[in-house]
Amino acid sequence: MFTWSGLYESINLGYDAIKVASYDCASFRFIKEIKKYWDKIFVSTGATYEHEIEKTVNILEGSDYHLLHCVTIYPTKLNQLHLSRMEQLRKYNENIGFSDHTKPYETGLIASKLAIWLGASCIERHFTILDENLTKDGPVSINPHQLNELSEFGGYDKLKQKEIIEDEFPSWQASLGNPDRKLSTEELMNRDYYRGRFASSLENKVVNNWENFAKP
């Protein structure tokens, strides 16, 4: 979900869950409105300060919400993942996932596999049936074969998962990073760019996601 107009257009489409992008984790009025219509809500927490995540968690209390750790660098390198951050997010909720923007054709599925082994309850990946070079997000998208591989990995026990990880990425601990890490300059620049990228035209007004707007 990227805009107010998209929110209202989606209400009657029959979806029982909705996903909020990292750049709207701090769009508090937007999230309040989403909570009115959906109980199951996935929220990425990339490029978001701790006090903003806390406020969003307070808004979502009482719903079936999932927080996704995310690094908003496209593509994300394996040493930029800070996957130990997932454990830090568990102070808010046990439903913690990972939004993965690594390049599968360079680093495989190791980032998602590592997150699953570390206890992620859900994984978000861009998905395509096209060649990786045909779309803007193709380089960070997985194809049906890779999706099947990831699904199979999720069905293995923890011991087998660890064996696979250590075989594919012996230096996996480099991806754990710092649970209290600071947002990087690149993430903050992306926050400024993407937060202002989408707006809605509603009731003859241009409305950004972080602004107060709600249909009566």
Residue ranges, per PLM feature:
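Catalytic cores and adjacent flexible loops of soluble metabolic enzymes
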Residues: 1-216
